[in-house]
Amino acid sequence: MGKRILILGAGFGGLAAANALRKNLSAEHRIVVLDRKNWFMMGLVKLWILEGSRKLEDSQTPLAGLSAKGIEVLNDEVIKIDTTASAIETRDNGKIEFDYLIVALGAELVPDRVPGFVGNGHNLYDPLQVPGIREKLLSMNGGKVAIAIMGMPYKCPPAPYEASIIISNILARAGAGNSQIDVYSPAPMAIPAAGPKLSATVVDTISQHGVRFNPLHKLKSVTESQLEFDNGVVKDYDLLIGIPPHRSPEVVRASGLTAGSDWVPIDKHTTRTSIHNVFAVGDVTEIKVGAIALPKAGIFAEEQGKVAAQQILNEIGIGPTAASFSGQGYCFMEVGNRQAGYLSADFYNKDGPSFNLDPPSEENYEKKLNFERTRIRDWLF
């Protein structure tokens, strides 16, 4: 008898899992992907929209391509996850039972957690707001631009620093190169998960573009012209660009899968939750590696999605020994002018997490373009 495998979320993890499952399972097994959106767009695209090299409407790929592969797509919202009954409740399609569940719902942004941000600040991680940020920058004649990381952890750790360089370039080209750009972070270093050495390299890179890094500055409240931080510091600003606090979606927290925390704890190798037939992958999860947590990045979600799929295939009796998540990943750090650095990491290294940052090059930038291109091709066509 065929199994129904339900995947909540059509991001990196969900799409990777759905494709791996469909590739290896016969048609008697149903694979269902549910997402509120009917399209997929990588988060990295927001930087290209900010830069002006890409438009939002040209960056959204319809999920309809999954149907041609034999993957069912539900454009719906999950409102309850009942792990005891192995079922979910949805807004439009009612109750849906499952044999296996993969939770890949990502992280929820909570901009109103910082009083005054909504209405005064602009959300860098909301693709609908990014074109407006670009327009604001193009209209500036100078002034103070504040980029505030409002909570930890957050998706794609290098992104605020990449954005600061892009913003510096935009202002310089617009004749407002005398503007002051500050990045504020609650953390003691730029990218805590990557350690002090690599963080220092990141700070040095942005400083070459006139951007100042302000560690240990957790945003407390915002007014029309001022930022107040937990450490008592008050700063003036003209344009505030924020990376809001993140947490798992309410429906996940209400399910009990987070065990009272903000994130779903999972087995670091298998992606299994505390429920035998429920897996969780990507930004919705938390994996502790010593004193740090695995960063929230698309490459980790993708690899975890493949592992969850192979774990399920193994239980069904298909394939070799179930796969194990390696803790290895990489990302690109853009520095403008079609140049990008290449950051690789091994969080499960037996001697402790290890990192390497290759210097910026046009070749790495082309690799980033290809990163998007190949995944969209493989997942949605």
Predicted regions mapped to residue ranges:
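FAD-binding core/adjacent interface of flavoenzyme oxidoreductases
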Residues: M1-R4, I71-E162, N169-R173, I241
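Beta1-alpha1 glycine-rich phosphate/pyrophosphate-binding loop at the start
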Residues: G2-I71, P153-A193
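FAD-binding beta-loop-beta segment adjacent to the flavin cofactor pocket
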Residues: W263-A280, V335-Y348, G352-P353
